[in-house]
Amino acid sequence: MDKEKLDVKIEYCNYAMDSSVENMYVNKVWVQCENENCLKWRLLSSEDSAKVDHDEPWYCFMNTDSRYNNCSISEEDFPEESQLHQCGFKIVYSQLPLGSLVLVKLQNWPSWPGILCPDRFKGKYVTYDPDGNVEEYHIEFLGDPHSRSWIKATFVGHYSITLKPEKCKNKKKWYKSALQEACLLYGYSHEQRLEMCCLSKLQDKSETHDKVAALVKKRKQTSKNNIEKKKPKFRKRKRKAILKCSFENVYSDDALSKENRVVCETEVLLKELEQMLQQALQPTATPDESEEGHGEEINMGEKLSKCSPEAPAGSLFENHYEEDYLVIDGIKLKAGECIEDITNKFKEIDALMSEF
């Protein structure tokens, strides 16, 4: 078979398929059986579809075509959506009611149960294409935790109680909890299901605006309070530093004044001590040289008598001089009250120095 004949045959097949699709589906309507154990799609003629009450459920036994009027009969071959597009057709989905329990087909995920509920931001649960047909649904997915998203109507179908769990590679616990929740909500009414949609509850726009404004105001007040709180802390620390510095200055001033006082008192005591020593030296000092020499001899004699180990301890003369005089560096000093006063002065000086 040459190439020209093959191209002609392919074109003929495409034309035959297009014409068959057109003849089969023009002026006809697909209706889904609402039996939860069936959910098959049946093709109705335009006359039969006109008799369908959209407010009432429809089942397979209501089909006038005897070939497909039982739930046990398999579904008719349904063309791919791309084939319909090539012929200029498109699938139009009827709008599912709010609060419906649905099953969503997701890529790389098992069919996931959810509830049709309003988007709290848009305030609606369905969007339409330019022709006025259903395009997307807002769905809150079941499971722990809930999640929400806008899904194309192509991937949204009725939930069936006979659904068998599919293989789930990831989030197995999440998928299991979603199926359990779907079984629980299956017997609920549409209104009760909407109450379970915690992520999608409608809020008044004015109320939302007020909440946002209150939140912004609260944040401003919080930031303002934080600034006000920070300022006193800074000032308090600054004041503490100033007080500490002042205290140290006062303390240092007190220490200096105390030091000056001790030094002055010590100087006074030293002067008094010097006067006492001068008074103690007066009896031994004589104006003429002969007396000075004589005094020196006496002093030397006293030195020898005191330093000599041979001198008797019980000598009255030495005892008299020991009681009345004290020899320091060869100088004879008056004893008695003068020596006692000098000792007391030294004690006072020691006390002042220890205090300093």
Swiss-Prot record:
A zinc finger (CW-type) spans 24-79. Residues 279-307 are annotated as: Disordered. Disulfide bonds: none annotated. Changing residue 41 to F: Significantly reduced histone H3K4me3 binding. Loss of histone H3K4me3 binding. Zn(2+) binds at residues 33, 38, 60, 71. GO terms for cellular component: nucleus. Keywords: Metal-binding, Zinc, Zinc-finger. InterPro entries: PWWP_dom, ZCWPW1/ZCWPW2, Znf_CW. PROSITE patterns: PWWP (PS50812), ZF_CW (PS51050). SUPFAM superfamilies: Tudor/PWWP/MBT. GO terms for molecular function: histone H3K4me3 reader activity; methylated histone binding; zinc ion binding. Residues 98-162 form the PWWP domain. Histone methylation reader which binds to non-methylated (H3K4me0), monomethylated (H3K4me1), dimethylated (H3K4me2) and trimethylated (H3K4me3) 'Lys-4' on histone H3. The order of binding preference is H3K4me3 > H3K4me2 > H3K4me1 > H3K4me0. The CW-TYPE zinc finger mediates its binding to trimethylated histone H3K4me3. This is Zinc finger CW-type PWWP domain protein 2. It comes from Homo sapiens (Human). The lineage of its organism: Eukaryota, Metazoa, Chordata, Craniata, Vertebrata. The gene is ZCWPW2.
